[in-house]
Structures are given as C-alpha cells and as structure tokens.
C-alpha cells in the first residue's frame, strides 16, 4: 500500500537560501512513516500499549531538487521487503508541479522497549503494511557510513529531556543536528 500525505513548507523548514533543510526532509519522512504505521495499527498508540516500537537503523536520501519556502509537497511512502528482523520503507517527494524532488530509503526494526531487544516482525505486521515491490534506488541495501579516523571538531553533549522520543532514547533527528554543529 502506498500512503500519501501533503506537507506545506514553512519558515522553520528552510535554510538561509530559502530551501528545505535536510533535517526537515527527515522529519517529513518520519511523520509520514508514522501516519502510515498508525493506519496499519502499529504506530504510536501501539507502541504505548504494547511496549514495542519501530526503531530506525539507517537512511539513504537523495535530493534531486530542493523545495523552497511555501512549496506544497506530496510525499509518498510504502513498506517494502520485510523479514523477521528488519523492514525497509521508501519515500518519494513531489512538489506542487508534480516534479520529483527527493527519494529515500530507510531500514527499521521492531524493538521490545522494556527489554531493549529486537522483536520479531510477524506475519500480522507484514499483512497490515501490505508491502510494495517498488524500490527508489537500484541497490537494495543501505551502505553503512564509516566514522573518520580523525575528527576536526568534537563537543561533549548531555542528552536533554526534549531529545528523548517515544521509544525512550535520543531521537535520530537530533543526531543530524549534532553532526552539523
């Protein structure tokens, strides 16, 4: 099932060049993925009720044309390959002129939050998402980034309460913010 949602670009979504920030793009992806999970019955309410939730493992994003302030974006997402431990979710971003602006893929796992362990993605979950056989990138796997041997900049950071997400850990978006610093 392909899920679609419209987002309007506001001031907080743009940089000094009047273009979408990378963090904003990831936030849009996360939100539409969450709305799709809500529809499938495995979203935020499920996490609170069952103590199980989706955890992002990695992303791959390609921006083809940067949206600007005021643009209305239609974002499409769908679950694809699912196995007992991980699943992939793809995204396409279109502007109001129906131009493809960005594509992305992400890899997720289901975690038992109380135990901090990976939980099985069972047949009921797979059926609820109705995975698509459609890929935005030719290669299926997301290449893992390698940490540089030397860092030009280091800061000490103490996790704040506002950094904690529904799964009880630092939200993945804040890591990108820290990397920019």
State each model region's role.
Residues 1-56, 103-105, 112-181:
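Hot-dog-fold acyl-thioester-processing enzymes
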Residues 12, 82-83, 96, 109-113:
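Short coil/turn motifs at secondary-structure junctions
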Residues 98-100:
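Residue-level signal for glycine
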Residues 89, 106-107:
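Short loop/turn microsegments at loop-to-beta-strand junctions
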Residues 60-96:
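Hydrophobic beta-sheet segments that form the core/acyl-binding groove
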């Amino acid at each position: 099932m392909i899920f679609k949602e419209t987002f309007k670009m506001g001031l907080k979504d743009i940089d000094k060049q009047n273009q979408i920030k990378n963090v904003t793009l990831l936030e849009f992806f996360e939100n539409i993925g969450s709305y799709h999970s809500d529809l499938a019955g495995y979203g935020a309410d499920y996490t609170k009720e069952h103590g199980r939730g989706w955890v992002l493992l990695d992303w791959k994003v390609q921006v083809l044309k940067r949206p600007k302030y005021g643009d209305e974006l239609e974002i499409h997402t769908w679950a694809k390959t699912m196995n007992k431990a991980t699943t992939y979710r793809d995204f396409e971003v279109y502007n109001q002129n129906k131009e493809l602006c960005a594509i992305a893929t992400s890899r997720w796992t289901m975690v038992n939050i109380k135990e901090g362990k990976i939980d099985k993605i069972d047949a009921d979950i797979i059926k609820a998402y109705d995975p698509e056989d459609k890929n935005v990138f030719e290669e299926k796997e997301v290449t893992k980034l390698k940490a540089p041997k030397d860092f030009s900049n280091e800061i000490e950071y103490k996790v704040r309460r506002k950094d904690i997400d529904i799964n009880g850990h630092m939200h993945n978006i804040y890591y990108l913010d820290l990397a920019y610093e």
